[in-house]
Amino acid sequence: MDSLKAFMQNLGESVNEPTEEDFAFMCSDKYEDEKSYTDDCGVDYSNKNRLLWGDLSLTTYNVEDGTKVVSANAFATRGCFNSSLHSLLISDSVVAIGTNSFSSSCYLRSIILSKNLIYIGPHAYSRCFNLLNFDFPESLKYIGSYSFHSCHKLTEMVFPASLRKIGSFAFSNCQKLETVTFKGILPYAGSGIFDECLNLKVIHIPRGSLEHYIKIMPFYKDKFVEE
């Protein structure tokens, strides 16, 4: 948390615990960072520990250690097959992934997320049609709207107890999604988070939490199983 505070102060903000809005701000282009350098893979980084812009011809990429933020639209494509990215490793220093960062990366199959990731922005991985199952870190607090929309090959999702919010339609149209597990009590769920997940069979929730989950996700009440 101390390193995160220092990063925020470097961006001109002073905060105790960053909010969802703070993380969105970190990832935005409101602060037009000066490009500090381009790495050997052709990826641009700022002088404020942000990955600014990626090379869409890369097939595999490891985000550099020390990076705090993957900026909005960093690897986003304007057409589904414009990106060649197949696998992605997010350094454990990264705390936030911005809006549309990897959206429509149609060949992307494998991602390893930072163990310290807190925020995933809206549409971050939407339309990554070939993305396979992956693990969310125990640090994660915010998953933005449509963040994994139309990730057709996901079959199982396990959400950490740290999670505070899932935005609307975050996992909508994940056609092969069958099993979801919540390790803790999710305070807020947007509308339609599993909309059009026609193969969803069961949502595992903690014992004693059924009333809460029916309240925040009433349309899925027949799928809840306490354990």
Give the positions of each predicted feature.
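Short regulatory "switch" loops immediately downstream of catalytic or recognition motifs
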Residues: 75-79
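Structural signature of tandem-repeat unit edges
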Residues: 1-44, 54-69, 80-96, 106-119, ...
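Consensus positions within tandem repeat domains that build extended binding/scaffold surfaces
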Residues: 51-52, 73-74, 98-101, 121-124, ...
